[in-house]
Design a protein with these regions (language model features):
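Glycine-enriched, solvent-exposed interface loops adjoining structured elements
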Residues: 1-258
Length: 258
């Protein structure tokens, strides 16, 4: 991130822009207005985490399965997955899911529910996969009866939008210190904080809403870029090609022609 700002900067900037007194301290301030600004900043930061998959918050989760264990605890800072990033790196296949409750019960109780691909869902704060890893259904096992774990990988957005300025690799989802580094775009966050404060006071938010939306639209697309789109896409072929064959594990023959 190009602009590094802390909690005190965001609150101070918002208050000064609204014509309020400049605070000497923020998180530990006894002033009721400053306390409300910090509380609204926590709300605004949480909203912005959900509102857009910020590149600063994207993390990769590598999961190595265990014999007989179908469900695994999610990362402690998990907020939500990036869609279609779930992959079985052992077999080089994308995972199938997330499955609905109805599909999951069909997988567990149906007559024709098994297959080589791994299915998944998120339930009760855990990442659950089907089939359950075991020596029987692990297709990569070199020796019959030997368990070989699957290595699964996926990307998610962390809920922690603040970084401790004094402690390495320490992140928070709520303000704890004036010096906590804001990982979100500070100008969007400042505009949103002003809007939240005006809204909380029951005042007319028309101007601040316009300012926030304009700042959001102007800066959000610069966060990580975007691909170029064509107005004349090519239709995919119905014949055998790169779009409809597996990524690997297909028989290439023994080199002998018949």
């Amino acid at each position: 991130m190009a602009e590094v700002r802390d909690v005190k900067w965001v609150v101070t900037q918002a208050m000064v822009e609204m014509g309020l007194p400049k605070p000497a301290e923020v998180v530990t301030s006894p002033d009721s207005t400053v306390q409300q600004m910090v509380a609204l900043l926590n709300r605004a930061g949480s909203d912005m985490v959900i509102g857009f998959p910020w590149e600063q918050l994207i993390k990769e989760w590598i999961l190595t399965t265990e014999d007989g264990v179908p469900a695994y605890d999610m990362p402690s800072d998990w907020s939500y997955f990036l869609d279609q990033t779930q992959w079985d790196r052992t077999n080089h296949w994308p995972l199938l899911g997330p499955k609905t409750a109805q599909e999951w019960q069909w997988l567990k109780g149906g007559l024709l529910s098994s297959g080589p691909r791994i299915r998944y869902r998120v339930v009760s704060g855990q990442f659950e996969i089907f089939p359950t890893p075991s020596a029987i259904n692990t297709p990569t096992a070199g020796v019959p009866g030997e368990f070989v774990p699957w290595v699964l990988a996926m990307e998610y957005v962390s809920e922690n939008w603040l970084k401790d300025a004094g402690v390495a690799n320490t992140f928070y989802s709520e303000c704890r210190n004036d010096t906590d580094i804001v990982l979100l775009d500070p100008w969007i966050l400042t505009a949103y904080l002003k809007l939240k404060y005006w809204e909380a006071k029951g005042l007319d938010t028309t101007a601040y809403t316009k300012d926030f939306l304009g700042t959001w639209e102007a800066r959000i697309g610069k966060n990580k870029g975007a691909p170029m789109l064509t107005l004349a896409p090519r239709a995919r072929t119905m014949l055998i090609g790169i779009n409809n064959i597996p990524d690997g594990s297909w028989n290439v023959g023994n080199g002998n022609s018949t």
